[in-house]
């Protein structure tokens, strides 16, 4: 109802972000606002996810995806845009101008991948963890910016030049290779997410039934009931697990507006949502340990 009241002749569109939405939520929203306003789907972290057998990012007027290093389809960099209207799509393609992806940027990407692979190897991480503890304790921003780029985001006044860079052959080959693994990787993440759901007590967290392909499950998201995500992160860090403590920052704060009336949910999300890892380096034994620690947050 609040959104409907906000829509007027000056409204360009509305962006919907799939965090822990279900197919039911998605279909209700689309049926309610279709043809009332342009709908843009933020499916950045949900490539391959479906609602009623239709891919997220292709349900509304526009959709966009991210194929960055940590996404479920990794091409090292870049993403994709979906445009439903064929005429608008043809116009966009005819006007779009591409620039070659700089070689130095490609080298930097490959070096970043190698560094991440090295430091987050399970064996190396046992030693690297002590360094991370120091980074968090001393708040060494140079390192934290690499771990949590979203917390130190620079808001651009103009479209960055990199938005015009085309894929090069390395990104194409990496994308093709990873595209073949999207389904099997998803099933592995889903199994791990379901294990978290089974092991974590309802007393300490709200959990979501998001196992029906309507979420790509890059992480398993819970809402903490009795503590906040910063305290939960600190406790798990003591036990050897660096769990991402912040999912999304509250952009409302950037405007210097401390009125929480219209944005209660965003304040709640920023402090209470906790993202549990389901990547390849996390074993079932790790999940059991993490869940046992979380169950102490009573």
Located regions from the model:
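PLP-dependent aminotransferase class I/II
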Residues: 13-17, 28, 50, 86-298
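Active-site phosphate-binding strand-loop segment of PLP-dependent enzymes
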Residues: 2-94, 98-101, 275
């Amino acid at each position: 109802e609040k959104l409907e009241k906000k829509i007027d002749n000056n409204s360009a569109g509305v962006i919907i972000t799939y965090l822990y939405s279900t197919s039911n939520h998605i279909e209700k929203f689309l049926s309610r606002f279709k043809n009332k306003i342009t709908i843009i789907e933020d499916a950045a972290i949900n490539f391959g996810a479906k609602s009623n057998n239709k891919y997220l990012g292709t349900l509304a007027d526009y959709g966009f995806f991210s194929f960055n290093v940590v996404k479920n389809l990794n091409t090292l960099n870049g993403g994709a845009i979906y445009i439903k209207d064929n005429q608008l799509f043809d116009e966009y393609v005819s006007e779009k101008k591409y620039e070659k992806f700089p070689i130095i940027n490609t080298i930097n990407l490959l070096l970043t991948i190698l560094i991440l692979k090295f430091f987050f190897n399970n064996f190396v991480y046992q030693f690297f963890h002590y360094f991370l503890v120091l980074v968090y304790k001393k708040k060494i921003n140079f390192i934290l910016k690499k771990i949590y780029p979203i917390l130190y985001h620079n808001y651009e006044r103009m479209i960055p030049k990199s938005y015009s860079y085309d894929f090069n052959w390395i990104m194409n080959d990496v994308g093709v290779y990873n595209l073949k693994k999207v389904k099997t990787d998803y099933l592995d993440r889903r199994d791990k997410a379901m294990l978290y759901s089974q092991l974590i007590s309802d007393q300490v967290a709200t959990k979501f039934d998001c196992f029906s392909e309507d979420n790509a499950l890059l992480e398993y998201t819970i809402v903490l009931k009795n503590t906040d995500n910063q305290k939960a992160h600190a406790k798990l860090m003591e036990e050897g697990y660096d769990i991402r403590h912040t999912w999304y920052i509250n952009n409302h704060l950037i405007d210097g507006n401390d009125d929480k009336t219209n944005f209660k949910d965003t304040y709640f999300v920023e402090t209470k949502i906790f993202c549990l890892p389901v990547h390849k380096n996390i074993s079932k034994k790790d999940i059991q340990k993490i869940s046992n620690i979380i169950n102490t947050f009573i």
